[in-house]
Amino acid sequence: MEASRCRLSPSGDSVFHEEMMKMRQAKLDYQRLLLEKRQRKKRLEPFMVQPNPEARLRRAKPRASDEQTPLVNCHTPHSNVILHGIDGPAAVLKPDEVHAPSVSSSVVEEDAENTVDTASKPGLQERLQKHDISESVNFDEETDGISQSACLERPNSASSQNSTDTGTSGSATAAQPADNLLGDIDDLEDFVYSPAPQGVTVRCRIIRDKRGMDRGLFPTYYMYLEKEENQKIFLLAARKRKKSKTANYLISIDPVDLSREGESYVGKLRSNLMGTKFTVYDRGICPMKGRGLVGAAHTRQELAAISYETNVLGFKGPRKMSVIIPGMTLNHKQIPYQPQNNHDSLLSRWQNRTMENLVELHNKAPVWNSDTQSYVLNFRGRVTQASVKNFQIVHKNDPDYIVMQFGRVADDVFTLDYNYPLCAVQAFGIGLSSFDSKLACE
């Protein structure tokens, strides 16, 4: 009798283990369902930032001047040089050096083959397929019926909006393709740290992957570079660390290896306890942990800081955010910023208003549309769904120059477009900060 009990016990343990796993999976599925319902209900609120519906009906109704902001706007100078300042996004450019895409939309054949260019890392495509990560992302299916021409619409020309020949300059002047101005993407690590070329908008997509047992609570984010002819290149991946008191996202140029010890680790995003302030770091070592053990060359740099305005009184409306980045040199390189303690961090200097060699950006205030009873921004066809995450980043001295814009096009698909002086890691970190929950801002 005792022997039979011993023989049955392993089977009983196995059944019990399977039941526990099923219960855990059912609980996770239920929590994910509740979260999705809450998010869908939240998107229907009038305080979400909506894409301007008049942006696609240009001839139907004239728009106000504040809704006609081009994605890239380099004003036509009276002389042959545009003045440049450290605290502004403008750059020293001659008119013949401004490469502006055409105003007209690109025409893409419906049966064009969707391909993905991956960085030249050995075995990257095989590793993507092995881990069931889609390397050929069909963005046209994920935008819920949005036409390709809307998603691939090019920004306005670099000439001034007040110019009388603006309508003909876009078609008459052959613009150099943006792909030729992005440089060599084979060295992916160098590319994600380099500022965007002046006069070029780097267009990207972020895919949020919730597949797997715990990815509903800790999803993985993949950032792709959009190229001509519907090609995409993988750039960055990030995932929120599980055992961390504050939000902590590790950023990697490898879609599979998202560990801090990996060779592909390029930075991280960390928040405070309330989730209202974030800092983007590179792959360097924390000066407090490596004091006296590492040289200055290996000390980590602060690439950006993001601060969301708290909403302690419960007033609803669009989020208000500020972005602080290091200034740029005359050679258009970012000034290395390596604080040795928290009192000298980007956030601390911004709060103390000691902004020497720093650049402060902020989100563009959306316009209240009385017809739709919602806040709207003109994303020029790049954002198609309402979300509190939709925003545009500008500088106060040049509010028409969109440094970065971010918004939703599907449930788990977002567009991210950035310009000089941001780099890919900075832009990705700013976008990730929008995903994280904020206790005092909702």
Swiss-Prot record:
Residues 23-68 are annotated as: Required for association with the IFT complex A (IFT-A). InterPro entries: Tubby-like_C, Tubby_C, Tubby_C_CS, Tubby_N. GO terms for biological process: anterior/posterior pattern specification; bone development; brain development; bronchus morphogenesis; central nervous system neuron differentiation; embryonic camera-type eye development; embryonic digit morphogenesis; embryonic neurocranium morphogenesis. It is found in: Nucleus; Cell membrane; Cell projection, Cilium; Cytoplasm. GO terms for cellular component: 9+0 non-motile cilium; axoneme; ciliary basal body; ciliary base; cilium; extracellular region; nucleolus; nucleoplasm. Its main location: nucleus. The keyword Nucleus applies. Keywords: Cell membrane, Cell projection, Ciliopathy, Cilium, Cytoplasm, Developmental protein, Disease variant, Membrane, Nucleus, Secreted. Residues 101-177 are annotated as: Disordered. GO terms for molecular function: enzyme binding; G protein-coupled receptor binding; intraciliary transport particle A binding; phosphatidylinositol binding; phosphatidylinositol-4,5-bisphosphate binding; protein-containing complex binding. Associates with the IFT complex A (IFT-A). Interacts with SIRT1. It is linked to Hepatorenocardiac degenerative fibrosis: An autosomal recessive disorder characterized by progressive degenerative liver fibrosis, fibrocystic kidney disease, and hypertrophic cardiomyopathy with atypical fibrotic patterns on histopathology. Disease onset is variable, ranging from childhood to adulthood. Belongs to the TUB family. Negative regulator of the Shh signaling transduction pathway: recruited to primary cilia via association with the IFT complex A (IFT-A) and is required for recruitment of G protein-coupled receptor GPR161 to cilia, a promoter of PKA-dependent basal repression machinery in Shh signaling. Binds to phosphorylated inositide (phosphoinositide) lipids. Both IFT-A- and phosphoinositide-binding properties are required to regulate ciliary G protein-coupled receptor trafficking. During adipogenesis, regulates ciliary trafficking of FFAR4 in preadipocytes. This is Tubby-related protein 3. It comes from Homo sapiens (Human).
